[in-house]
Amino acid sequence: MEGRYKDYRIRFSPGWVEVVQDDVTVPSRRALITGATGLLGRAVYKEFKENSWHVLGCGYSRARPRFECLNLLDEAAVKALIQDFKPHVIIHCAAERRPDIVESQPELASLLNVVASENLAKVAAGVGAFLIYVSSDYVFDGTSPPYREDSIPHPLNLYGKTKLDGERAVLQNNEGAAVLRVPVMYGDVEKLSESAVTILFDKVQFSNKSANLDHCQQRFPTHVKDVATVCLQLTERKIQDPSIKGIYHWSGNEQMTKYEIACAMADAFNLPSSHLRPITDEPVGATPRPWNPQLDCSKLEKMGIGQRTPFRVGIRETLWPFLVDKRWRQTVFH
């Protein structure tokens, strides 16, 4: 579905100037992406854009020229933007996702993860937009995996609690909304520290120094482009079937500790891994994290929804621009 509008451009020639009117075709399906400047948000923005949606991306601290600068804590601004753009779907990617930061700044984290999500749910319901709230596997304590959508949540840390409270606020204020729980993600990062997965790469590359890595807590690293695909598929299914709502799970299916993730990175680039040391003791003084919050994704799988990128394939594509050994990069990729 597409719409047309008039656009104007100025054509310059020697001795004269002409104003030219063009017909411009734009998709009539509209998607609003919050947190569009973040790792997941960028992938979701790209996925909808490449599938003929008219996409408006919002950011705040990292807002850029092509994105709308929007403070999600400003209720009036959020309402005005949504009522003006009239999106068919809102993918709510914006969140404070770092557990340690949430513990140190609980009030601010609660405002963004809970209060802003509640307000967004209300406004989305008011304009009839389908809302997908991206949540986390940290709503579970990790003691009895795998977890289904109807498993009883029990977050161990404040981050997990704010995401769970955000889920409840969304579903209580927008009965047609969906919650998509996902695990730790990686993808086309702007810097290695943007993902809890890719941040390990420096420890892998600098093999002249031993590195201690957790070999206890289980993780399921998931590519953001796979999550973006699920968001698009779920949205397009909603258009056909209004009963699509409630909680869904999506996750990569390769189980790894941080130590195993680092070893897989080393293997992907033929780098040494003997300097990587597995630590099986529980971290002392760290923010508590679930041991194994594996998500059961069979609900979406039975619907024919989902995509999984093999970890070694995805991590190689993600990390090669950050290789210190440029000669290796040029040899393999060019």
UniProtKB/Swiss-Prot annotation:
Q: Where is this region: Required for interaction with MAT2A?
A: 319-334
Q: Which SUPFAM superfamilies match?
A: NAD(P)-binding Rossmann-fold domains
A GO-annotated cellular component: methionine adenosyltransferase complex
Under the GO molecular function aspect, what terms does this record hold?
A: methionine adenosyltransferase regulator activity
Query: What UniProt keywords apply to this chain's record, in alphabetical order?
Result: NADP, One-carbon metabolism
Sequence positions that bind NADP(+): T37, G38, L39, L40, Y60, S61, R62, N71, L72, C93, R97, Y159
Q: Which GO terms describe its biological process?
A: one-carbon metabolic process; S-adenosylmethionine biosynthetic process
- Source superkingdom: Eukaryota
* Pathway where this protein functions: Amino-acid biosynthesis; S-adenosyl-L-methionine biosynthesis; S-adenosyl-L-methionine from L-methionine: step 1/1
- Read off the Pfam families from this record: RmlD_sub_bind
Spell out the subunit comment.
Heterotrimer; composed of a catalytic mat2a homodimer that binds one regulatory mat2b chain. Heterohexamer; composed of a central, catalytic mat2a homotetramer flanked on either side by a regulatory mat2b chain. NADP binding increases the affinity for mat2a.
The function of this protein is: Regulatory subunit of S-adenosylmethionine synthetase 2, an enzyme that catalyzes the formation of S-adenosylmethionine from methionine and ATP. Regulates MAT2A catalytic activity by changing its kinetic properties, increasing its affinity for L-methionine. Can bind NADP (in vitro).
* The family this protein is said to belong to: Belongs to the dTDP-4-dehydrorhamnose reductase family. MAT2B subfamily.
Give the protein name, as stated in the record. Methionine adenosyltransferase 2 subunit beta
> Which source organism does the UniProt entry give?
Xenopus laevis (African clawed frog)
